[in-house]
Amino acid sequence: MNKKQKVIVSLLKEIDEICRQNNIMYYLSPRLTLCAVTEQPFPQNPLFGVVLMKVEDMERFRRLIEEDPREKRALESMKSHKWFPGFYLRYENTDTICINLDRTRDYEYPGIGVNIFPLRTSSVSGTAKSRISRAENGWTQLCDINQTECGYKNRINRTLMRLQCLINGRQRQASRLYERFCREFQGEGAEQYILRRRKQTLTFPAEIFAGTKTVTLEGEEFQVPAGTEEYLTICYGNNYREIQEARYVIPSSMIVSARVSYAQFWKEEGNYEKYCKERQKNSRRLVKARKYKKYFNECWKYVVLCGARMNLGIFYKSRKDYIMNLYKNEDYMALEKVFRPYYRMTEKSLQKGELFAEDVEIFDIYVDTLEKTGRTVQRSKISSLI
């Protein structure tokens, strides 16, 4: 193992010791459980240090660490940091550095750490679940300044959350959201537990987490769910033993080191706060530039379509006499063959909510040909626009 992996294992071991001393149940993440069960090496990705806890246990763990903080360690959450990106905890080694330069404000102490994700109960009422879901979505959207795509509902949730932050203050709003989350999603007698991540949501039967068993990972003992096989099957499928760890390459936007602390690094490199502000400005400019680029690309595609439509219109005008003659003779088979390019161009125009009618007489002949040859789908689309 390299030094970064050793730091993560040491943090996992500290979490294990704290939980055992205080009767708190925790479980290794599916990825780490897979590595332990299949005897694969510890993941290279520094973000794969993850454990799971039930919501009430996670809150107990947070309070224990706050009451008895450890040297060169930090526990972050929405309760303590107004830019924290979600409903989870992060236990960090402050003598290291692990920072995404595109998300510089996510953590107050950007060191190598272990994320503690909550197992949510499914017994929450529909109204409360919907309310928390909207709030979580709004908070996530507000924290992710680099997001390029944002749907209508996401924009509404983000706007409402921004207004609430302006009224209550961002730190107070973050703390309220976290407290409401803990209050709503904890409770005994749950039939299912839900693990919600940024890109994936998994649902587990409660029996899986009824107890724990011990596994060995890199020479250290950790806890995993008693129903390990079902746990891994839900996450990775029946062939989970065949899954191999992909080769990991640190992205250019990441700085990861176990040899130097984030404070020392920025002391040598320059003003951290100033750098974060400049980086955020550049990120916003980049997001705007991408939006403009997408808009200009769509405009250019429309210009190309209009040019192709104009050229095809000129072509059909040059063959107008021939088309009129076929129409007088009611030769619809020949007309259908002649109008094939016209049909394709009409389809493209209808996608834009427009008609391809460069010449009215030719267009009328084309519509009549559609009706006579049984192409009623496009005929009905044209009728809705006329």
Which functions belong to the PLM regions below?
Residues 1-20, 62-134, 138-235, 242-281, ...:
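Conserved catalytic core of two-metal-ion nucleotidyltransferases
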Residues 16-49, 53-59, 207:
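Active-site nucleotide-donor binding segment shared across nucleotidyl transfer reactions
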Residues 299-303, 333-345, 375-386:
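Alpha-helical repeat scaffolds
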Residues 310, 345-356, 386:
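Boundary/linker segments of alpha-helical solenoid repeat arrays
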